[in-house]
Amino acid sequence: MTSVLRGVLKTHLPRTLTLPRCARNFQTTTFLRNEQVKLPQTYDEEKVIIDEINENLKPDDLQASTRLRNIGISAHIDSGKTTFTERVLFYTGRIKAIHEVRGKDSVGAKMDHMDLEREKGITIQSAATYCSWDKDDKSYHFNLIDTPGHIDFTIEVERALRVLDGAVLVVCAVAGVQSQTVTVDRQMRRYNVPRVTFINKMDRMGANPWRAIEQINAKLKIPAAAIQVPIGAEENLQGVVNIIDRVALYNEGSQGETIRKAEIPEDLKELVEEKRALLIETLADVDEEMADIYLEGEEPTVEQIKSAIRRATIGRKFTPVLMGSALANRGIQSVLDSVVDYLPQPNEVLNTGLELQKDGSEKPVHLTPSSSEPFVGLAFKLEEGPYGQLTYIRVYQGKLKKGAYMTHVKTGKKVKVSRLVRMHSNDMEDVAEVGAGEICATFGIDCASGDTFIGQGTQQQITMSSMFVPEAVISLSISPKTKDNGAFSKAMNRFQKEDPTFRVHYDSESKETIISGMGELHLEIYVERIKREYGVDCITGKPQVSYREAITVPSAFDYTHKKQSGGAGQYGRVIGEMNPIESENKFETQIIGGKIPEKFLFACSKGFEDCLEKGPLIGHRVLGVHMLINDGQTHVVDSSELAFRTATHGAFKQAFLNAQPVILEPIMSVEVTAPNEFQGSVVGLINKLGGMINDTVNGPDDFTVTAECSLNSMFGFSTSLRASTQGKGEFSLEFLKYSPTAPQVQKQLIQEYQKAQAAKK
């Protein structure tokens, strides 16, 4: 008898997995109830299935899909995403006036609707809106999501990309590819999202789009080539040249709303031809049709170039690069045209769900973007609104109507769609129905982020896979200043339901409520929101690192739990071995001859889960352990599920402590940018923290250092950096990996833990 318990911890899943669309958080070869199921691993394989689905689509469904784009705006923090989105809304007529991030008019950008966002000048929550864009006498409907750039709010990017078909990656013309740009690229790959790239801030001193494109090719490892050349640079930026059709585009009017076409300036003609040749050459490397034209020495037509860009972009083999300045109102309209020309419509993306079988197994099923098919939708984001919980839903198949009923797949409950809205930041507009490929929101539904809904009476029980949720790396204790903590509990319940990376638990030993998250800013924002939205002042403890415990060598165990001193006894014996593994924790049994009944083995698996939550060394979670039980013994009277669960606890501790255990600490990727004159101070500061410098890039005015530092050493770093750079330096942190602590640190942590435990007795 063999049973395997998987998925207890997912911290060490490879971060560069290529995941199938919407079966999008299991690996390309997935084990479902011990049945191996092959899914498409490349877009070419996906395209075969997509073409088969499209052959059976009705003309109305094809027409609706052709005019629809679901896109996200993603980038490193301060690259200008929200400013870019504000221009998109203005040029599409969605808003009547432009307001800046942290603007002087106290209005702020439309998509940053929280007071905290407008005060701090950062995006905290992803905000959804929709708009229309006219091109070639056709009107296209965009569902648009602006996402945060700060790594602490990475879950907002995850859930946006989870339901989008394409994205605009915004890159700073001065800083180029930065740490969070790499993170966003990894997230796009995780969900197979094609992108067009916009190099922003071309009006800034030191802007260099060609260096940025080189970095996209080198650091993001995706072929990229410019489809535009800037007219002027820095403060003299006037417009761009479209190198495909060789036309100069100038933004005119008080807010760049008018586009004037003209001949290419004489001094740019040679550069345009050089970049056009490079574009064609790059496309020939990633597109077969363009390769044939290129090898035959022919000059491709404008339509052939555009078609090749579209095929290669949707196939995730290439990203076209545009350039301009959102703040200076230059080049935005060209990006909107490129969204239409090069990013996929819903019927060009393969969306896969899992059909639940009667025997409990799951079978992949490809969804059809048709409004006549049974409804399938995913709740990808929850938000507390003025009328109760607001649930954002992506419709993958069928249509959703106001007043209709749908079934919550996880619970089987029938729920009524009492109100259906399209969101425009924090404003909402009621609609009667939405079709396949659309994004909408509804009220009054009790669900969690990642839950699937299907149409009432649908024969197939289909579920969509959930999004990737990174592990929390930092924790702190929190308590309300007043004893009346009803509002405090309500806030805790709401926020952890809305944000999967915000975790709350009660420590029974310290009698404290502990909150965990992605970084100091992440937790600071929630503490501030509890105060503002619930009127509860909180006392917080010092931030604590979320350590992990692991083993380094195999260890055998033979443990007997025996309590036979009169009355009902307890007896359970387990024999086996424990091994270190690099993947998630794993529990396995290989019992021959039924020496231990199945119900007791299940109790052993529960005991294993118990032990993972609190390791033997310092009480932190355990990582990378494979526990195998291959023998044991029962007592005809005294054996029970409790006895074997307790025996597993003892065996785990015995084997763990004999396996040369280590304490792991989070290592962060740190990127610091500051003026060149402070380079020595910054490098010295990182060395003082015990950091390892990986790369240094010097620009005309600023330099950027990338390093690896332990999270524990980074507390208070912002204060030290301000002092070292006269307040002119900035930095970003991202979790990189877990690594063993120094022996003296491990010894100190164990001693402190043992001392604290002894004090509680």
UniProtKB/Swiss-Prot annotation:
GO process annotations (BP): mitochondrial translational elongation
Residue span of the annotated presequence: 1-33
Keyword terms, alphabetized: Elongation factor, GTP-binding, Mitochondrion, Nucleotide-binding, Protein biosynthesis, Transit peptide
Pfam families: EFG_C, EFG_III, EFG_IV, GTP_EFTU, GTP_EFTU_D2
Keyword Nucleotide-binding: yes
Pathway participation: Protein biosynthesis; polypeptide chain elongation
Domain tr-type G: 66-347
Principal location: mitochondrion
Binding site for GTP: 75-82, 146-150, 200-203
GO molecular function, one term: GTP binding
Keyword Flavoprotein applies: no
Protein family according to the UniProt entry: Belongs to the TRAFAC class translation factor GTPase superfamily. Classic translation factor GTPase family. EF-G/EF-2 subfamily.
Role summary: Mitochondrial GTPase that catalyzes the GTP-dependent ribosomal translocation step during translation elongation. During this step, the ribosome changes from the pre-translocational (PRE) to the post-translocational (POST) state as the newly formed A-site-bound peptidyl-tRNA and P-site-bound deacylated tRNA move to the P and E sites, respectively. Catalyzes the coordinated movement of the two tRNA molecules, the mRNA and conformational changes in the ribosome.
Listed name of the protein: Elongation factor G, mitochondrial
Gene designation per UniProt: MEF1
